[in-house]
Amino acid sequence: MMLTVDSVAGGYGDIQVLWGVSASVEAGHVTVILGRNGAGKTSLLNAVAGFLPTVRSGQVRLGDLELGRLTPFERVRAGLAYVQEGKRVFHRRTVEENLLLGGYTVKRPFLRRGQRLQTALDRAYERFPILADRRKMVAGRLSGGQQQMLAIAQALIPEPTVVMLDEPSAGLAPAIAKEVFAMVEGLKREGLAVLLVEQVVDNALAIADDVIVIEAGRVAASGPVSDFDDTAMVRDLYLGRGSAGLRQAPDPSDR
């Protein structure tokens, strides 16, 4: 299943933060979105998920399905998962209760079939063995890295085809962050499409197939990860000092 974002423009009320942004990711691939803080990376994910208050133009498609008129709940049902920044779990609920809550975002036939839900739980514990060991522990007692794993595992319970991750390594120790990136690479091997916003450039590029650089709400550059193997060049892109040798996105005003 391919996720396609085509020339999306929008923002928060009268404040426009995205200016004709396009992106895509296909099954079994990771597209990494890079950019400075405030560049519009999270706003792009919010637009895809249905959380951006104002979308003035453009389209978001999941396969052949146009998502523009769907609610965030309906987008999850369609196969989209979104793990927001900040280890968003229910701290007073157990690990297993958190995972079961992930099942309430899917169609009721799924919930009535206990075996399917149990299969989803088993898969979550297979992906994250540490969660299986702590299934009866309240989430608030988990480490930061374990809470992030739980947030990702919960998003995967409905068996999505596309997963969006907003800075999953934020606030994690380097060793734990590597575990999270290894998990993302595992999702790629399973055939999921992954749209990843990250600040840890080296780790992100190591698992990426394609890269998009956003600057001031516009795509500054995009291309296969092989175009971004020059660390100095990537640093310059972060600082907004150019993108020589990379494919430039067309300016929407030129259309």
Language model feature labels by segment:
Residues 138-142:
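Conserved ABC ATPase signature
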Residues 13, 53, 95, 100-116, ...:
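ABC-type ATPase nucleotide-binding domains, specifically the catalytic core motifs of the NBD
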